[in-house]
Swiss-Prot record:
Keyword annotations: ATP synthesis, Cell inner membrane, Cell membrane, CF(1), Hydrogen ion transport, Ion transport, Membrane, Transport
Annotated organism of origin: Pelodictyon phaeoclathratiforme (strain DSM 5477 / BU-1)
Protein name: ATP synthase subunit delta
SUPFAM superfamilies: N-terminal domain of the delta subunit of the F1F0-ATP synthase (SSF47928)
GO molecular function terms listed in the Swiss-Prot or TrEMBL record: proton-transporting ATP synthase activity, rotational mechanism
Species classification: Bacteria, Pseudomonadati, Chlorobiota, Chlorobiia, Chlorobiales
Length: 178
């Protein structure tokens, strides 16, 4: 089974259980803690992915690291994942959980790239217009690309709306050449 499929199944099961048990906010908070630790500890991720580290040892490692920061329900999930030899997928499971949660809540990530940093007012106006355009809540991820000269490029899912001056000049150049 591919890692994406397995990750999505575990994430979906965790999301369903958290919703049914009415402890979704707790799980979301605890997953943020776990993700933060995993992002800052490459050795932990290697240990969880290593076939040389036995499942019981992985459970013990997870318990030692997270005993003061996650609840019993999350420990049950972590034990299950380790017991099923999927502890190495924890980063992917957490990412898939966030994707599923965002889909359920109607939130989308939007990459906004500009030549210079947008002001708070410009960002708010752009986010408002994008929310009206998509019908969803927008989570903006801002970036700066100095090669743009000016303008903004917006990436929503797989679609890019490029309103940068450099892109417009490139399109003008193509039309003049052909």
């Amino acid at each position: 089974m591919s890692t994406l499929i397995a990750s999505r199944r575990y994430a979906s099961a965790l999301l369903s259980a958290a919703e049914e048990g009415n402890f979704l906010n707790q799980i979301v908070d605890e997953l943020h803690v776990i993700k933060e630790v995993l992002e800052h500890s490459r050795d932990l991720v290697y240990a969880l992915r290593s076939p040389l580290v036995k499942g019981d040892r992985k459970i013990h490692i997870l318990e030692e690291i997270f005993k003061d920061s996650v609840g019993e329900k999350m420990f049950l999930f972590l034990r299950l994942v380790a017991h099923k030899k999927r502890a190495g997928l924890l980063p992917e499971i957490i990412d898939e959980f966030q994707i599923l949660l965002d889909e359920k809540r109607g939130v989308i990530n939007v990459d906004i790239t500009s030549a210079t940093a947008l002001s708070d007012e410009q960002t708010a106006e752009l986010v408002t217009k994008l929310a009206a355009f998509t019908g969803k809540e927008i989570r903006p991820r801002m970036a700066i690309n100095e090669q743009f000269i000016g303008g903004v490029a917006v990436k929503i899912g797989d679609t890019i709306y490029d309103g940068s001056i450099s892109h417009q000049l490139q399109m003008l150049r193509k039309s003049l050449v052909s």
